[in-house]
A protein has these predicted regions:
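Flexible "cap/lid" loop of the alpha/beta hydrolase fold
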Residues: 112-149, 182-187
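Conserved alpha/beta-hydrolase
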Residues: 47-69
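Active-site loop/oxyanion-hole signature of alpha/beta-hydrolase fold enzymes
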Residues: 65-95
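Catalytic active-site module of serine/aspartate enzymes centered on a nucleophile-bearing elbow/loop
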Residues: 228-263
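Serine-hydrolase catalytic-loop signature spanning alpha/beta hydrolases and amidase-signature enzymes
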Residues: 35-43, 55
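Short beta-strand/loop motif that positions the catalytic acidic residue
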Residues: 196, 202-204
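Conserved loop-alpha-helix segment in the C-terminal half of the alpha/beta-hydrolase fold
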Residues: 206-235
């Protein structure tokens, strides 16, 4: 991901770009979800940097081309939360932390450990203690889960992409920790919303995967966090990519900046 400087944070990696002149707005830390890497934020990172914001994007351990460390298949949610905390610690001041999908379970848990300026949760995985949350079928453990084939990636992530764009996306996906997936799918990891002292925006994609994001769940997540909620009717799960991403970015950040201004 061609975003400023590269810095290793243990088994993770941070891509970081500072503005020419520091401004009053907090930095933004971008955290990807399962199978993805910092590359999925390329467009958002460029837009944020062009607006004069300090922006950083995280490659979690074993993602974005990083080697899988020992015990990767047995690494659960809290192991990956350590990477997010390290990313926050690498910045000079509290950040707006943006999570996508499974990253939206990691981000609030990190925000329970470090001060943040705000949380933006896009197409979020639910906390384990969300009332009414639906479990998802578990995956076999013992070895990393292979990257999703292109057609499954299309239906789950990116029904809006062309065949060429989809092939590029599928080629970048990486093996995932089954422990991480199962702790999310089995709703094993609770979050304490009272321990997060920052405004929160939950973004719902109207064309998201209904198995993992059933109708009403994203709005329920917003209520759980006492946060704001925006639904983008035509947005898929990977709303950071492909046709429409410019409109979705504008809508999301107009709402997020308004929320931060009111905080």
């Amino acid at each position: 991901m061609p975003l400023g400087t590269e810095r290793r944070l243990g088994h993770a990696r941070l891509w970081h770009r500072r503005p020419v002149a520091d401004g009053p707005r907090p930095p933004v830390l971008l955290v990807h979800g399962g199978y993805h890497g910092a590359w999925c934020w390329d467009y958002w990172a460029e837009r944020l940097a062009a607006a004069g914001r300090e922006v950083a994007a995280l490659d979690l351990r074993g993602h974005g081309g990083l080697p899988q460390p020992p015990g990767y298949a047995e690494t659960g949610v809290m192991g990956f939360v350590e990477d997010v905390v390290a990313g926050l610690d690498a910045l000079d001041r509290p950040a707006v932390v943006v999570g996508h999908s499974l990253g939206c379970l990691l981000v609030p848990l990190a925000a329970m450990q470090r001060p943040t300026a705000g949380l933006l949760l896009a197409c979020p995985s639910p906390p384990g203690n969300l009332p009414g949350a639906q479990k998802v079928r578990l995956v076999p453990e013992g070895a990393p889960v292979p990257p999703l084939p292109a057609e499954i990636a299309r239906s789950r992530y990116a029904i809006h992409l062309s065949d060429t764009e989809l092939a590029d996306l599928a080629a970048k996906l990486c093996p995932e920790s089954p422990r991480l997936l199962n702790e999310r799918y089995d709703l094993r990891i609770p979050v304490d919303p009272a321990a997060i002292g920052a405004p929160i925006l939950v973004v719902e994609g109207g064309r998201d995967d209904p198995e993992r994001h059933p109708t009403g769940q994203d709005a329920a997540i917003a209520r759980f966090y006492d946060g704001d909620h925006i639904r983008l009717d035509d947005a898929p799960h990977d709303l950071m990519l492909g046709p429409g991403s410019d409109r979705w970015f504008d809508a999301v950040w107009a709402r997020m900046d308004g929320l931060l201004g009111a905080a």
